[in-house]
């Protein structure tokens, strides 16, 4: 399954059905922070909430539902979903693990930690574990935590100053 940006089949999506109460409440919370004529300012948060609702990825239907809820053309929301690396447009493992491999992390051993995680999980960057528990995201160029290098983001939470033992502990703790 993969979001394709073909919204013809989603033309009649009802955001009140496709989006959970929790997702709509999250979007409404963010809409309240912006002027009424700036609904598109909440698209990032809307997509985040929809992705969380859908166990870590965005389908065409959810992208279209967020867009309709915000009175936007679906392609606008799709462009955001496919531009930012924080969004997944195909089904992936339940837990999203992203190692930073930029210069600070690389100089502090990120390459070895990625190899360690790949061996431990039995999958490579860009793949999910066979049981669907973990998605080892493609390399992240920079996650803006150079002072804590090497680091990883797991389900949106930063973990810094990693060692192989700490990586094991983090990965073993994911359900």
Description of each model-found segment:
Residues 1-175:
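Signature of N-terminal electron-transfer/Fe-S-associated modules in redox systems
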């Amino acid at each position: 399954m993969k979001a394709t940006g073909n919204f013809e089949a989603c033309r009649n999506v009802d955001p009140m059905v496709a989006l959970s109460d929790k997702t709509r409440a999250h979007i409404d919370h963010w809409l309240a922070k912006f002027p009424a004529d700036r609904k598109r300012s909440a698209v990032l948060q809307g997509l985040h909430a929809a992705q969380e609702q859908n166990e870590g990825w965005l389908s065409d239907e959810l992208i279209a539902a967020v867009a309709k809820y915000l009175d936007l053309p679906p392609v606008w929301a799709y462009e955001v979903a496919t531009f930012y690396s924080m969004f997944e447009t195909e089904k992936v493992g339940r837990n999203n693990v992203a190692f930073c491999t930029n210069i600070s992390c690389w100089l502090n051993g990120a390459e070895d930690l990625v190899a360690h995680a790949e061996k431990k999980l039995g999958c490579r960057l860009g793949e999910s574990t066979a049981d669907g528990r973990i998605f080892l995201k493609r390399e992240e160029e920079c996650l803006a935590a150079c002072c804590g290098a090497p680091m990883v983001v797991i389900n949106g939470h930063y973990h810094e100053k990693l060692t192989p033992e700490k990586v094991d502990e983090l990965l073993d703790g994911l359900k």
